């Protein structure tokens, strides 16, 4: 929106051409979303408290979590609002990738909103029935996958890229739709499973979003892409604005979500942010790198899958409780220790993911 204004004002003063730089608009995206989050946060928390929109806590979980009952939830609406406003202000609105990622983020956020709302109304932690949650996730995930497949302009946009392996590209054809579906829906649910402790999900999301933002910037520049042997995806660089907005909104939300949390993001935030990360990774053809950088999300998801499979097959549990962050809590780790150690793991994994740029 403001980019269009800057382009118009260039005819009066050449200084407005500075807004053509992606790096500047990415930074402005961070700052705008951060300020919006910090500004709207207190108002949102007060509103949620007045309307008694509080978190319902599982009674079979760690006893320390019982004190969290009633903490305002659905704070993800703050994150999505800041991301949306900042992106619309600073991104090129003629870019199809910007609209795809925004649409996926808001649609998955809508699923989470309904889920959170039902939890609040029914005063339990079940929310929207799983079959309906997965149904709508599948509808929106497949919709995004089909759109990206149908609008692909070059073969590389539907090709599987394997990091660390030079010049190895696997054309996916219609398989691109299937892979994209699983990446988007899987990422959405993985972040949601991770969102069980104060600040546990949002900081890794910010870190992974920052890492993917770097890939977006590089993939959108033909010179960088050729030098680093990564796919050149015209227009993908514009997603650095969205990633910047995600970083700013996430950090602003963390101000209120850090231990002990004043507000939880709820499914409205977790489902949306996970889907956004998955969609961005698909666009820049870095699904494998997302798997690496989002290792904490993968670990949380696998712990649930292993726990369920083990109990159904043998009647025994592998972990004291799943997702795995609860396992460590029940082992006696204080909540802040679990959170910070998972953050440290994410820092390392994001650096490993970025290292694949040179290890080819």
From Swiss-Prot:
UniProt enzyme class: transferase
Transmembrane recorded as keyword: yes
Membrane topology annotation: Multi-pass membrane protein
Cofactor(s) listed in the protein's UniProt record: Mg(2+)
CDD domains: GT_MraY
Annotated NCBIfam families: mraY
Family: Belongs to the glycosyltransferase 4 family. MraY subfamily.
Protein name listed in UniProt: Phospho-N-acetylmuramoyl-pentapeptide-transferase
